[in-house]
Amino acid sequence: MAVRFPKNLVQPEGSMRFGLDALLLACFAAREFGASPHFGLKNPCRDTPWLPPGPGFAAIDLGCGQGASTAGLLLRSENVRALGVDFSPALIDAARKNISLLNLSERAAFRVLDLSRAGASFPRPAFDLALSNPPYWERGEGRASRDSLNDTARRGEGALSLFIRAARTALVHHGLLYLIFPASRFTALAEALGSCRFGMRKALPVRPGAEDAAVRVLVEAEKDTVHDIRFLPDLVLQEADGSSTPQALSFCPFLDKSAGAGEREQ
């Protein structure tokens, strides 16, 4: 039986529904890491016991939620194994179920982890790349949610710095971090990355339509470097009639509801 990703993902009651951002992040990371000159990263700790055994690069999804970005990365990158971590046992349980439905369990593992304790969990850097879709707002900013899991995913005091520090702990020297963040907070993101000795390498603005301003930015940052940003051509998601643009479908095939780009035989 074919299981189509991202349709019918298991999502706990009261959690933030996964959305387009998670899919865009996965496709951006897969594309840019595959094209990176650091594709030959030397990582003697890559075979961490937290990852399923096997060949390939080691990825970590920080705040993985239901596993949408983890699954998307694995579907787009056949030579990557991934660990997803989240503070919520309910979300980790959902992520494991989703990965199992997609027959990706041999390449992915999930673990409950408080990112403030990442240093104790990763005594030595072990990952080549990291993904993060961190809370976009500080505590008190943005629209509050009545559901605690949903609200925690949206905002948190010092949350952005917490996620970036966790990435620094987990990544090897010159490892690559991929994030998605509101375009309106690009300066805050640059400052947070710089304070943790991550240098921005690429930035991809994302616009809903051709006449719209960017609402998101996808970023590649490198550990132990300084900012040297190359802005990529804007990604425009929708035509005037609301359909996905050819550019968007090429970038993220998971947006094509009529195609089987995310199908896996079960």
Show the residue positions of the predicted features.
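Class I SAM-dependent transferase core
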Residues: 1-31
